[in-house]
């Protein structure tokens, strides 16, 4: 049993995180209070502030941001609903970073792609084909998951990749997907999909700069391997 058992509704209004946020703004709240606003409710043994404080004493924000749903639900007091709220929070934060004027969002090499996506891809149980849409200076203007599941040239259609490229006036595209096995070596289907999309890009005047396959702590660039000229 936790020592701090006062229910949120029994706390003075000026001490409740949501009311404090509304009155003073989010910058006035501690990390535990901000997390409690996201989680909304605690358990029968802990109010949400106490629960949030405990979680952040056991896991830092970086660890929480990198945890998948399965890992989050192993935390005491966190079920599927709360795990989904936490995962959605950090995914929004990651998407926001794409639109900031951050030099890390300029793609200069395949290693930049790997550094950006590996923290999210390393725990995925299925292949996720992701497109990074770039402007003329190779800054990311949009990131989009195109398909989930094993790549197949008959399933992945160029229009799914280039629809957003045209809508965003993207100058070029970088493809990336993960190999849950941990081995980033390209399969014949990986190469076939890449060749199909490169040809589709040529027709539309949108360059496919690379296809980066992410494995366990390593990656393969199909550009560097000579599959994309």
From Swiss-Prot:
A motif (JAMM motif) lies at residues 177-190. It comes from the Archaea. Residues 106-228 form the MPN domain. Zn(2+) binds at residues 177, 179, 190. GO terms for molecular function: metal ion binding; metallopeptidase activity. PROSITE patterns: MPN, UPF0758. Keywords: Hydrolase, Metal-binding, Metalloprotease, Protease, Zinc. CDD domains: MPN_DUF2466. One of its GO terms (biological process) is proteolysis. It holds the Pfam family RadC. Signal peptide: none annotated. InterPro entries: MPN (IPR037518), RadC_JAB (IPR025657), UPF0758 (IPR001405), UPF0758_CS (IPR020891), UPF0758_N (IPR046778). This is UPF0758 protein Mbur_0382.
């Amino acid at each position: 049993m936790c020592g701090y058992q006062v229910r949120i509704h029994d706390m003075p209004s000026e001490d409740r995180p949501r009311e404090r946020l509304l009155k003073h703004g989010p910058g006035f709240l501690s990390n535990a209070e901000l997390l409690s606003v996201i989680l909304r409710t605690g358990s029968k043994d802990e109010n949400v502030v106490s629960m949030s404080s405990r979680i952040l004493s056991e896991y830092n924000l970086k660890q929480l941001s990198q945890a998948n749903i399965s890992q989050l639900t192993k935390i005491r007091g966190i079920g599927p609903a709360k795990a989904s709220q936490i995962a959605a929070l950090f995914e929004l934060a990651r998407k926001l970073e794409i639109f900031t004027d951050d030099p890390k969002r300029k793609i200069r090499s395949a290693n930049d792609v790997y550094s950006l996506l590996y923290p999210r891809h390393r725990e995925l149980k299925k292949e996720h084909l992701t497109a990074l849409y770039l402007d003329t200076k190779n800054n990311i203007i949009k990131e989009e998951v195109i398909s989930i599941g094993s790549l197949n040239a008959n399933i992945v259609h160029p229009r799914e990749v280039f629809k957003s490229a045209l809508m965003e006036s993207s100058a070029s595209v970088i493809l990336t997907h993960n190999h849950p096995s941990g081995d980033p070596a390209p399969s014949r289907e990986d190469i076939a999909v890449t060749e199909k999309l490169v040809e589709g890009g040529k027709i539309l005047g949108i360059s496919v700069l690379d296809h980066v396959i992410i494995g366990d702590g390593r990656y393969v660039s199909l550009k560097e391997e000579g599959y994309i000229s």
